[in-house]
Amino acid sequence: MENISIALPKGRMADSAITLFEKAGIAENILKDISRKLVVNDHKNLMKFMLVKPMDVPTYVEHGAADLGICGKDILLEQKKDCYEVLDLKFGFCKMVVAGPKEAKDSFLTNKRVATKFPNIAEEFFRQKGENVEIIKLNGSVELAPIVGLSEVIVDIVETGNTLRENGLIVIEEIFPSSARLIVNKASLKTKSQRIKEIIIKLKEVVETFKEV
């Protein structure tokens, strides 16, 4: 039986991802210490789980360091890594939006500046709208950008909208909804086909019983 490695996301989706695998009967009671250890081996079932930054999950999967991984649809669309997206896991719901001060919604700027952690998504969105924008790539809290005059608007992921409201910003336009997805390394799906398909089936059975973990 082949070893299977799985990359799980740190942060807001970690608990839901772990719960999903436990409900599916995969690595029961194995994952409780993963936030401390980062890598957990299930020697009995020949499985290895690793906890990585959500943005890094597709890279681990694309390069074969992980056979499977969980990350948001937003990350997949931004990075366009060479791996298979096989299942919508129905948790980690959020939206990619254009947001800014209320006055930004009521005005039209031909050369507006857009601050974002998702430059590829932002560029493609405004290109399709025929709008000429300057994309400013940030790694931290993008909500600050319009407040201090770095940009007119932002493109970012919104879950509850509380952070926007707290900073005097509103959603101007929704780009797409996002949720957690299961991704698979292309080579692994060929060489470890039976084991990976068994895992996918078990996870799918759990996903079909609920709307959100």
Curated annotation (Swiss-Prot):
Its EC number is 2.4.2.17. Pathway: Amino-acid biosynthesis; L-histidine biosynthesis; L-histidine from 5-phospho-alpha-D-ribose 1-diphosphate: step 1/9. One of its GO terms (molecular function) is ATP binding. GO terms for biological process: L-histidine biosynthetic process. It catalyses: 1-(5-phospho-beta-D-ribosyl)-ATP + diphosphate = 5-phospho-alpha-D-ribose 1-diphosphate + ATP. PROSITE patterns: ATP_P_PHORIBOSYLTR. It is found in: Cytoplasm. SUPFAM superfamilies: Periplasmic binding protein-like II. It comes from the Bacteria. Pfam families: HisG. The keyword Protein transport does not apply. Keywords: Amino-acid biosynthesis, ATP-binding, Cytoplasm, Glycosyltransferase, Histidine biosynthesis, Nucleotide-binding, Transferase. Its main location: cytoplasm. GO terms for cellular component: cytoplasm. Gene3D superfamilies: Periplasmic binding protein-like II. InterPro entries: ATP_PRibTrfase_cat, ATP_PRibTrfase_CS, ATP_PRibTrfase_HisG, ATP_PRibTrfase_HisG_short. Catalyzes the condensation of ATP and 5-phosphoribose 1-diphosphate to form N'-(5'-phosphoribosyl)-ATP (PR-ATP). Has a crucial role in the pathway because the rate of histidine biosynthesis seems to be controlled primarily by regulation of HisG enzymatic activity. Heteromultimer composed of HisG and HisZ subunits. Belongs to the ATP phosphoribosyltransferase family. Short subfamily. Lacks the C-terminal regulatory region which is replaced by HisZ. This is ATP phosphoribosyltransferase.
